[in-house]
Structure formats: C-alpha cells, structure tokens
Amino acid sequence: LAQDHDLIVEKLCEGKNFSHILKIKGGISDSHKKGSSVFIVSLDNGYQIVYKPHSLECEEKYQTFLDFVSKGCKYTIGKYTILNCGKYGWEEYVQQADCHTEAEVKRYFYRFGMLIFANYILNTNDLHVENLIAVGETPIIIDTETILGNYRVDYAETARDRIHLIIQDSVLYSGLLPCYKSVSYTHLRAHETRRH
C-alpha cells in the first residue's frame, strides 16, 4: 500500500490523501495463489479500495472491450477504476446504489442488455450474482479475471454436458440471466452412483 500510495490517491481516491487504514476486510472472493485473498481496505479519507493478489490485466482488457462495445450506443457500459501493478492490483470499491425513477430503471436494463451482448460475444460462462453490482442506472460486472470462456462441449455424455451443449451458444450461458433448472446436479449424481 505504501509503495502505491500516490497512485491510489490519484486514481482511486479522486486526489484525496490518506494516512491511515481504518479497516481491512478479507475473504471477499475466491482465494488465489497459495491462499492469497481479496481484501477491502477502508481508508481514513472516506474511500474504500479493493486489493487483489493477481495481475489485473484481464480486467483492464475487459474494460477496454466494454468501451469498444459502447461506441455508437445510446448509453455507455459501466466501468470502474483499476490500478494494475503487475502481480497484484487495486480497484475502486463498487458500491451498490438504487435507481430512483422509472427512467433510471429503463436505462439500467438497456445497459444490462449491452452487458449480456458483450459477455455473449466473449463466451463468458461463470458470472454469479455476486459479480453484478447495480450502481443506480448502471450495472457493473466485477471480479472478471476468468471472464473469457474456453469450456466448450461438442459431445455430451453426462447430464451436465448436455445442459452445456444446449445453452453454450445462448445468452443464458453467461449466468447473467436467470435460468431455472428443474434438475439438480447433486440429485443426478446421487442416482448415478446408487447401487440397485
């Protein structure tokens, strides 16, 4: 934190200096390299920042792609500030906020449709509800280090593979849209291993 102080103040704290850490909250995301974890750091200038123990290059590329997708559209896709420091990085803390008007809700869903399109193009397949934060009229995807999908099923032997085969070329594949399943994987596995 000390070595990145000036950049953090400039890029993540809108120029407001800090001298102390008030709080550190861990266990925010999946553990990375040898148990390293994501931390939310609360600073004495009123800002919170997110520490990630890995390169944020993928996140940077994703944000650049969102800029490209937004060109020529009525609205832009929401982004957040990233400070990639090589083997680790810092991010703006994205705080949830409500919409207050019907017009804001409409703009939110327009942008949400843009996100669905962008992630369909990337073949994204592992977004969870925790990855999507509503910031007023702007939906923002966070935690995107695994955003590019490379799991492809061309032949289905298991029920899981059959499901993937059916939805992998669909906007449902990203996980952004609700997908109601009448079959539980756990239930299927229990029957597959049961002896009769």
Q: Where are the model-predicted features located?
A:
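Conserved kinase catalytic-core segment
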Residues: 92-183
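Conserved ATP-binding subdomain of kinase catalytic cores across diverse folds
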Residues: 2-122
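Conserved small/polar residues in nucleotide/adenosyl-binding loops
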Residues: 186-193
